[in-house]
Amino acid sequence: MRTGKFTAIIILLFITFFISSSTVMYSSTVIDKIRPTSEEIPAGYMFGQVPGFAQSLLKSNPWAFDQTAIKKMASRIYPGGEPSRISDIHMTIITNKRNPYGDDIVCYILIFKNEKAASEEMAKLNEFVSFNSDRAITIQKKNLAVYLHVDNVKDFDHIKTMSETIRKRLESL
């Protein structure tokens, strides 16, 4: 009788662990593991500089948004972006060296508060990207989304390469 109870408890613990591990969500700690690094910047490009007028909101580049920036920028990143569903946003601006204040390539890493919020927000983001498929790419995994876009279609190959690197990093986590 005791052996049966012990076996049942072990099975129950295993099932609980399996279910909880399959629904683990990402937190801001994943950002540093997947974000673009200075070594990955294409030749002739650099991290962009934040212009003076924007420094009160965007403190530096690359930068993890504070809550004020999330509230002000969510709907500017993609139409209908809902800041209450986003826990973290990391932004990397890459620009041509000839124009250090430009935003030729931008990578946003968004961490949503839960998978339901991620699903609803990704629907909006994917719809937006579908209208800009020659200039934007998204990657989604659980409650995380990576959104890369370029101003000029000639730079699309750069974000394609960056997205492949980010995708590989996500798969290795």
Please name every model-derived segment.
Residues 72-106, 110-114:
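Mid-chain, structured segments of secreted extracytoplasmic proteins
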Residues 12, 51-53, 69, 114, ...:
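A generic structural signal for solvent-exposed, polar alpha-helical segments
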Residues 22-90, 156-173:
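N-terminal "mature-domain start" segment
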Residues 1-11:
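Bacterial N-terminal signal peptides that target proteins for export
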Residues 9-20:
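Bacterial N-terminal signal peptides
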Residues 27-41, 46-47, 97-112, 116-173:
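A short, solvent-exposed beta-edge/loop patch
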